[in-house]
């Protein structure tokens, strides 16, 4: 085990600063005002060892331990305890009672865990799910809160830990979930990379009294690293709550950010939009966001207009543009790949839409261009833009696949040697001078370099080909969202042997009567059709207006476009206009 592993640093912090606050969890499900519980470093370490002792009774080194627990301090103990026991932790969400959670079932089948860790509150739902006829034998269930977590912790250490600390199962927006094997070395390397960029003006170190604020789910890579791993690696206090707590009242997030000490957080694009729409002046009266060090914006496409609205909304509360840090990353690279330098505010550059659809990037005036955010020039990890067919680097201004190389890149996918070779074993042909040797990670994301800055246009597998031209669904969706405000899926479907554009749009109707509602739908249809034609030169074959929650998504909120196509083909969407 590396001296800088999560486990060794946890042990060190428990010894050097035993009574300092480590993790604070605010439970808003039991009380609307919130019930707060805090663990010190020594308490976290003790719980980790107690859980590890119990896990070790059912596991040998390298066995998988799946965590199916609600957000909370018990989840943290389960995750750390699994690794301390020499098992490979597998963080997941809790399956719903009476429902078939395909993702959880797929992961259980792939990981073949020897033990399940949960809590007494959801043990029934977990047991119901894992004991179904088609589910493989997955070992016993441990209820974390039923253990004596305040007693003496047993003294033991596993000498030879597995190479993988945990399996981060991908969202599966384009395929079945695959377990990315993340090592302690990956975690330490990626933490150093992101800290060097986010805090480059502070020599890669945040102020010692920094509080990391997060409501992101622990089973998602950004929530796991931000909420559990980064506080241990950096020695920072973490203030946590659940995704539901944020969705119910986004102002809770803002109050945690304004706790008086320097704070750091992260959120996907929709969270910034929701905070703008659902936060009233009364919710945040007297709030001061001046101590916010930064908020990472990632996990999904970052919309420039959303960030502008967020900054404008909270500017009276001392929030500044340079506090938002649009970032690019993926689970296969542990989490982080690129963002602009510390102190830089988000930069939006406009490019000719027609050129983008042919694979070129030409800057233009804002009135006629497609807005894209800059992610700076990545230095660590190393990034190249590559033609995915020839494996030759693309010149600046040419769209290609983003390839990544660095100690943060994972070893591969669990039990998937063919996919591992394809995704993690890419080799450059005729690499440019100064390019490191060895294999590269194919991200599946398309981007380009322009004036020494990287821009991202979308996923290769999501690209729409309509009338023989390439279009990026995120661009079309962004155009529509400026009108509707809700989730949008742009898909292409075959009609009479030709691919046609279909947009699925989630709407919450505001009309008081059926007649007013239909009039509202007609106005939206006309506005959306005109905007897509004007901005992208496309005709829409069908506008599918549906209630909120209709568009299938991954656990991290990414649109499952292939599933959208299938639902559309089978006429499974419930249309608001009949």
From Swiss-Prot:
Cross-link Isoglutamyl lysine isopeptide (Lys-Gln) (interchain with Q-Cter in protein Pup) per UniProt, renumbered positions: 355
Molecular-function annotations in GO: adenylyltransferase activity; ligase activity
Enzyme class, UniProt record, top EC level: ligase
InterPro entries cross-referenced by the UniProt entry: AMP-bd_C, AMP-bd_C_sf, AMP-dep_synth/lig_dom, ANL_N_sf, FAAL/FAAC, FAAL_FadD21
GO biological process, one term: fatty acid biosynthetic process
Enzyme Commission (EC) number: 6.2.1.-
Disrupted-gene phenotype: Disruption results in the complete loss of diacyltrehalose (DAT) and polyacyltrehalose (PAT) biosynthesis.
Keywords, comma-separated and alphabetical: Fatty acid metabolism, Isopeptide bond, Ligase, Lipid metabolism, Ubl conjugation
GO cellular component: plasma membrane
Domain of life: Bacteria
PANTHER family in the record: DISCO-INTERACTING PROTEIN 2, DISCO-INTERACTING PROTEIN 2 DIP2 -RELATED
Family: Belongs to the ATP-dependent AMP-binding enzyme family.
UniProt-recorded name of the protein: Putative fatty-acid--CoA ligase FadD21
Taxonomic lineage of the native organism: Bacteria, Bacillati, Actinomycetota, Actinomycetes, Mycobacteriales
């Amino acid at each position: 085990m590396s001296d800088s592993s999560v486990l060794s640093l946890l042990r060190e912090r428990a010894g050097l600063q035993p009574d300092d606050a480590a993790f604070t969890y605010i439970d808003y499900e039991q009380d609307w005002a919130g019930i707060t519980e805090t663990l010190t470093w020594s308490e976290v370490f003790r719980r980790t060892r107690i859980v590890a002792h119990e896990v070790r009774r059912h596991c040998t080194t390298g066995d998988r331990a799946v965590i199916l627990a609600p957000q909370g301090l018990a989840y943290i103990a389960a995750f750390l305890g699994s690794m301390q026991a020499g098992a490979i932790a597998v963080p997941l969400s809790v399956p719903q009672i009476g429902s078939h959670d395909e993702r959880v079932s797929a992961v259980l089948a792939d990981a073949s865990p020897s033990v399940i860790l949960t809590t007494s509150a959801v043990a029934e739902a977990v047991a119901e799910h894992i004991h179904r006829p088609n589910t493989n034998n997955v070992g016993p269930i441990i209820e974390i809160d039923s253990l004596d977590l305040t007693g003496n912790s047993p003294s033991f250490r596993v000498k030879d830990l597995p190479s993988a600390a945990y399996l981060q199962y991908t969202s599966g927006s384009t395929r079945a979930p695959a377990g990315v094997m993340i090592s302690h070395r990956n975690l330490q390397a990626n933490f150093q990379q992101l800290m060097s960029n986010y805090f480059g003006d502070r020599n890669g170190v945040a102020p010692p009294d920094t509080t990391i604020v997060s409501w992101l789910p622990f089973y998602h890579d950004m929530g796991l690293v931000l909420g559990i791993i980064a506080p241990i690696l950096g020695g920072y206090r973490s203030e946590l709550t659940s995704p539901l707590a944020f969705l119910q009242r986004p102002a809770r997030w803002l109050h945690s950010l304004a706790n008086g000490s320097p704070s750091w957080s992260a959120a996907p694009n929709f969270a910034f939009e929701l905070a703008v729409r659902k936060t009233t002046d009364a919710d945040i009266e007297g709030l001061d966001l001046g101590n916010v060090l930064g908020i990472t914006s990632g996990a999904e496409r970052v919309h420039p207009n959303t960030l502008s609205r967020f900054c404008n909304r909270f500017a009276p509360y001392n929030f500044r543009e340079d506090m938002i840090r649009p970032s690019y990353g993926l689970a296969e690279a542990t989490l982080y790949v690129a963002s602009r330098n510390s102190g830089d505010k988000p930069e939006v550059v406009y490019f000719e839409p027609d050129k983008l659809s042919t694979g070129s990037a030409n800057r233009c005036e804002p009135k006629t261009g497609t807005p894209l955010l800059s992610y700076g020039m990545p230095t660590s990890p190393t990034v190249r833009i590559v033609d995915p067919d020839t494996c030759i680097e693309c010149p600046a201004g040419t769209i290609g696949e983003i390839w990544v190389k660095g100690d943060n890149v994972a070893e591969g996918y669990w039990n998937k040697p063919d996919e591992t070779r394809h995704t993690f074993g890419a080799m450059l042909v005729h690499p440019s001078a100064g390019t490191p040797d060895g294999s590269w990670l194919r991200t599946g994301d398309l981007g380009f370099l322009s004036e020494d800055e990287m821009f991202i246009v979308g996923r290769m597998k999501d690209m729409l080909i309509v009338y023989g031209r390439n279009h990026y669904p995120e661009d079309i969706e962004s155009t529509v969202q400026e009108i509707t405000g809700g989730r949008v899926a742009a898909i292409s479907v075959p009609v009479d042997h030709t691919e046609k554009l279909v947009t699925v749009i989630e709407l919450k109707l505001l009309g008081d009567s059926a007649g007013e509602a239909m009039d509202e739908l007609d106005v939206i249809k006309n506005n959306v059709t005109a905007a897509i034609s004007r901005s992208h030169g496309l005709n829409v074959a069908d506008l599918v207006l549906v209630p909120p929650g209709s568009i299938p998504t991954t656990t991290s909120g990414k649109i499952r476009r292939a599933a959208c196509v299938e639902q559309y083909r089978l006429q499974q969407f419930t249309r608001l206009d009949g």
